Design a protein with these regions (language model features):
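Alpha-helical solenoid repeat scaffolds, predominantly canonical TPR units
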Residues: 30, 66, 100, 134, ...
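Structural marker of alpha-solenoid helical repeat scaffolds
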Residues: 73, 107, 141, 158, ...
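Extracytoplasmic/secreted proteins, especially bacterial periplasmic and envelope-associated proteins
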Residues: 62, 96, 130, 181-184, ...
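Canonical positions in the second alpha-helix
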Residues: 34, 70, 103-104, 137-138, ...
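Alpha-helical adaptor scaffolds
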Residues: 78, 82-159, 163
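TPR/TPR-like (Sel1-like) alpha-helical repeat modules
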Residues: 140, 167-195, 208
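Extracytoplasmic and endomembrane cell-envelope/extracellular-matrix remodeling and assembly machinery
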Residues: 1-102, 178, 194-195, 199, ...
Length: 220
């Protein structure tokens, strides 16, 4: 019986194969062969997989040629937007990624693929305040999203806001249940807080929360 193809599922499979299942050189060979078979039902996924394989092999221009063709037919596809962001950043043109993503993020600001790619593009473009603002809004809704905290930490570090950087690192450790490491990071943050007494008060309160969490964990 003929079953309609699930495009998103096929793209997800291609992504896993291209990025994780094969070594970089063989991934290129595999997807070049898949594209050459010209099976229409899966050709788009094979092209996408080939683009990702080219990226792993540092053949960025070849990857971009394919992704330009794919995204022209499906501009809102999250798989394609994610890949194009990586390509623009690899080419040293993160602002092109920012502009590409902007209307999609405006329409759907809570989508993690869009928000985190936009934040990454901002950081790559040295627009740290924009990245932090976007990530703060995202974390209001998805406060336990690890990658968002990691990107926040990177933005703070590159903008030399070291107290905030250590606070973001603390949140990452806490998500893993490593509360003692989280407390260490907050103590570093406290030392960088200077004369900001309100900030120090917030840090002390968070230290207490993490120590309480560690005590509860030890009692289990």
């Amino acid at each position: 019986r003929y079953l309609p193809i699930n495009k998103q599922f096929e793209l997800a499979k291609a992504r896993i194969k291209a990025r994780y299942s094969f070594k970089a050189d063989y991934a290129v060979e595999y997807f070049e062969a898949a594209v050459a078979q010209d099976v229409q039902r899966s050709k788009e996924a094979s092209l996408y997989g080939l683009a990702l394989a080219y990226m792993r092999a540092e053949k960025i221009e070849k990857a971009k040629d394919i992704m330009d063709e794919l995204i022209a037919k499906d501009r809102g596809n999250l798989f394609y937007l994610d890949a194009m962001t990586d390509i623009y950043i690899s080419q040293g043109e993160p602002l092109k990624a920012v502009e590409m993503l902007r209307p999609h993020v405006t329409h759907n600001p809570r989508n993690q693929v869009l928000a985190l790619n936009q934040a990454n593009a901002y950081i790559s473009a040295n627009k740290y305040e924009e990245a932090v603002s976007l990530l703060k809004d995202f974390l209001l809704v998805k406060k336990d999203y690890q990658l968002a905290h990691q990107l926040m930490s990177e933005a703070y570090q590159k903008s030399k806001r070291f107290s905030q950087m250590h606070q973001s690192k603390a949140e990452v450790y806490a998500l893993y249940g490593a509360y003692n490491r989280a407390v260490d990071e907050l103590q570093y943050a406290y030392n960088f807080a200077g004369d900001d007494h309100l900030e120090k008060q917030r840090i002390r309160a968070r230290i207490k929360q993490f120590r309480d969490q560690e005590e509860r964990l030890q009692r289990l």
